[in-house]
Amino acid sequence: MDFAIRPVRDDDTKDLVQLSLLAWAPVFPSFKQMLGDGIYGLIWPDWRASQREAIEQVCKDGDQTTVYVAELDGTAVGFIAYVLNLKDKTAEVQLLAVHPDHQNLGIGTALNAYALNRMKESGVTLARVDTGGDPSHAPARRCYEKAGYTALPLVRYFKDLTER
């Protein structure tokens, strides 16, 4: 499969929103099952709206966020977004998504490698990414481990203070 990786364009936003909603659809039911309806509803009352807003923000935030798109036959099939902190020589991957029809074909791996090379060319010495520890994030963890990231297990706790 021959795909190209290129910088995001203004006309990509709508496609990247749709792609990300499909790619992350399995994640939110997993979160809901783990957290329960109460806490889940407090964090993500409408996960689709939250994701749409996040994607729209990174696509228009060219001064702060770098976004690259994987394109196959003129169609966006994946993307990666990261932020550079040149003062600290660090970078953080904020988002990585591959359309479900194109997952497990090396697109996420290629996007990671491409972004890591651009980071290194910018003088970055340390890259980081956060991802979930739940079963729905297993493919993401494999992708990051394949790219050479080292995991630091963390636990995040939530407490619903609206309960009596």
Task: Enumerate the language-model features and the residues they cover.
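Basic/polar N-terminal segments that are highly enriched at the extreme N-terminus
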Residues: 1-2, 164
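Acetyl-CoA-dependent GNAT
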Residues: 3, 7-94, 99, 112, ...
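Conserved acetyl-CoA pyrophosphate-binding loop and the N-cap/start of the following alpha-helix
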Residues: 102, 106-114
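Short polybasic/polar patches that bind polyanions
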Residues: 103, 120, 145
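Conserved beta-strand-loop-alpha-helix junction that forms the acyl-donor binding cleft
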Residues: 103, 128-140, 158-162
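Short coil/turn segments at alpha/beta junctions that flank glycine-rich nucleotide-binding fingerprints
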Residues: 105, 122-125
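Conserved active-site alpha-helix within GNAT-family acetyltransferase domains
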Residues: 109, 125, 133-153
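Terminal substrate-recognition subdomain of acyl/acetyltransferases
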Residues: 146-147, 155-164
